[in-house]
Amino acid sequence: MANLRKTHPLLKIANDALVDLPTPTSISAWWNFGSLLGLCLVAQIITGLFLAMHYTADITTAFSSVAHICRDVNYGWLIRNLHANGASFFFICVYLHIGRGLYYGSYLYKETWNIGVILLLLVMMTAFVGYVLPWGQMSFWGATVITNLLSAVPYVGNMLVEWIWGGFSVDNATLTRFFAFHFLFPFLIAAFTIIHLLFLHETGSTNPVGLNSDADKIPFHPYFSYKDLLGFAILLIALISLSLFAPNLLGDPDNFTPANPLVTPPHIKPEWYFLFAYAILRSIPNKLGGVLALLASILILMLVPILHTSKQRSLTFRPFTQLLFWLLVADVIILTWIGGLPVEHPYVVIGQIASFLYFFLFLFLIPLSGWLENKALKWSCIDSSASERRSCKPDVGG
């Protein structure tokens, strides 16, 4: 009798995705972040569900209900700290996952990559509406500033903002709908994650050398399932350590003050994981231009597969593009630093230079370096009969 996991309609799906999945032997720890993101999502949904049982989405009691969770609910302080810091770890894993995709050419699986960019936008929206819920000063003013950006949309901008607010300012209606969105979006993210995996398993994973690995694959379980479990352990140890020893390290002190529409905080800034995009937004003195730059800073990822000029998939054997990749990483770190600083000289100029470099690297320098490396290698690639395979040989006497 055939094994049940291979014949049962439901178990067969799980088996093909988690047990008998053919996996390249050479994939490194950089391929762990997909499963770590799955762990983060599950942890966020579970902790969020328990928080939602005690939270009240009303401006008069929201702040008090969060205090009540931390003071009176059994282990409420731990659940709240795990949820708040879990968001930070979620974004750390997201950015490392995207970085790995850029470095190793995973973006050439266009459907998987584009679904991933949609997932990034959904995760960012979820984190933004979630940050508003404690109804502290930074929650209120962050919501006011960011939603106000939509007023830059021509003709319908003001109407759009009032529609999102549910009135003429950020008020009770805004908080209620943001709570509804924050509860809904994680399940939408879970659905898109399944689609993301569906497209990934159509092609299989890439590998560090960027070559076709059909001839050298092993089952996902037990080899990579145990490797993923090690990643789970490291992530959970780091998350629990941060939540227990320095739970407010990544938060904003202003959020310990209840929201007051009459007092503006001296520096309005989002959570650390949005600072790079916030710096790009602030670097353009025009409101509409800033909003477009903010959107472009994320949506530019969708252009990466189109702008791929190299005959090699991965950056493993492309030293010049490697240099530009790490320059991009440094640039994003600089943007994150600038996003948390006040709008004054010299930070404004540094932010503008870093923002220009961010787009210049994606749109011009990295595609140019791929083209130059092709010229340097003098490769002529001949398409084989299989469309996804390419046999490459150096030009002789060229």
From Swiss-Prot:
<feature type="binding site" description="axial binding residue">
    <location>
        <position position="97"/>
    </location>
    <ligand>
        <name>heme b b566</name>
    </ligand>
</feature>
<comment type="subunit">
    <text>The cytochrome bc1 complex contains 3 respiratory subunits (MT-CYB, CYC1 and UQCRFS1), 2 core proteins (UQCRC1 and UQCRC2) and probably 6 low-molecular weight proteins.</text>
</comment>
<feature type="transmembrane region" description="Helical">
    <location>
        <begin position="347"/>
        <end position="367"/>
    </location>
</feature>
<feature type="transmembrane region" description="Helical">
    <location>
        <begin position="33"/>
        <end position="53"/>
    </location>
</feature>
<comment type="similarity">
    <text>Belongs to the cytochrome b family.</text>
</comment>
<dbReference type="InterPro" id="IPR005797">
    <property type="entry name" value="Cyt_b/b6_N"/>
</dbReference>
<comment type="function">
    <text>Component of the ubiquinol-cytochrome c reductase complex (complex III or cytochrome b-c1 complex) that is part of the mitochondrial respiratory chain. The b-c1 complex mediates electron transfer from ubiquinol to cytochrome c. Contributes to the generation of a proton gradient across the mitochondrial membrane that is then used for ATP synthesis.</text>
</comment>
<dbReference type="InterPro" id="IPR030689">
    <property type="entry name" value="Cytochrome_b"/>
</dbReference>
<dbReference type="InterPro" id="IPR016174">
    <property type="entry name" value="Di-haem_cyt_TM"/>
</dbReference>
<keyword id="KW-0479">Metal-binding</keyword>
<keyword id="KW-0830">Ubiquinone</keyword>
<dbReference type="GO" id="GO:0005743">
    <property type="term" value="C:mitochondrial inner membrane"/>
</dbReference>
<dbReference type="GO" id="GO:0045275">
    <property type="term" value="C:respiratory chain complex III"/>
</dbReference>
<dbReference type="InterPro" id="IPR005798">
    <property type="entry name" value="Cyt_b/b6_C"/>
</dbReference>
<dbReference type="InterPro" id="IPR027387">
    <property type="entry name" value="Cytb/b6-like_sf"/>
</dbReference>
<feature type="transmembrane region" description="Helical">
    <location>
        <begin position="226"/>
        <end position="246"/>
    </location>
</feature>
<dbReference type="GO" id="GO:0046872">
    <property type="term" value="F:metal ion binding"/>
</dbReference>
<keyword id="KW-0812">Transmembrane</keyword>
<dbReference type="Pfam" id="PF00032">
    <property type="entry name" value="Cytochrom_B_C"/>
</dbReference>
<feature type="transmembrane region" description="Helical">
    <location>
        <begin position="178"/>
        <end position="198"/>
    </location>
</feature>
<dbReference type="Pfam" id="PF00033">
    <property type="entry name" value="Cytochrome_B"/>
</dbReference>
<keyword id="KW-0496">Mitochondrion</keyword>
<keyword id="KW-0249">Electron transport</keyword>
<feature type="transmembrane region" description="Helical">
    <location>
        <begin position="113"/>
        <end position="133"/>
    </location>
</feature>
<keyword id="KW-0349">Heme</keyword>
<keyword id="KW-1133">Transmembrane helix</keyword>
<keyword id="KW-0999">Mitochondrion inner membrane</keyword>
<feature type="transmembrane region" description="Helical">
    <location>
        <begin position="288"/>
        <end position="308"/>
    </location>
</feature>
<dbReference type="InterPro" id="IPR048260">
    <property type="entry name" value="Cytochrome_b_C_euk/bac"/>
</dbReference>
<feature type="transmembrane region" description="Helical">
    <location>
        <begin position="320"/>
        <end position="340"/>
    </location>
</feature>
<feature type="binding site" description="axial binding residue">
    <location>
        <position position="83"/>
    </location>
    <ligand>
        <name>heme b b562</name>
    </ligand>
</feature>
<feature type="binding site">
    <location>
        <position position="201"/>
    </location>
    <ligand>
        <name>a ubiquinone</name>
    </ligand>
</feature>
<feature type="binding site" description="axial binding residue">
    <location>
        <position position="196"/>
    </location>
    <ligand>
        <name>heme b b566</name>
    </ligand>
</feature>
<dbReference type="GO" id="GO:0006122">
    <property type="term" value="P:mitochondrial electron transport, ubiquinol to cytochrome c"/>
</dbReference>
<protein>
    <recommendedName>
        <fullName>Cytochrome b</fullName>
    </recommendedName>
</protein>
<keyword id="KW-0472">Membrane</keyword>
<dbReference type="InterPro" id="IPR048259">
    <property type="entry name" value="Cytochrome_b_N_euk/bac"/>
</dbReference>
<feature type="transmembrane region" description="Helical">
    <location>
        <begin position="77"/>
        <end position="98"/>
    </location>
</feature>
<keyword id="KW-0408">Iron</keyword>
<keyword id="KW-0813">Transport</keyword>
<feature type="binding site" description="axial binding residue">
    <location>
        <position position="182"/>
    </location>
    <ligand>
        <name>heme b b562</name>
    </ligand>
</feature>
<keyword id="KW-0679">Respiratory chain</keyword>
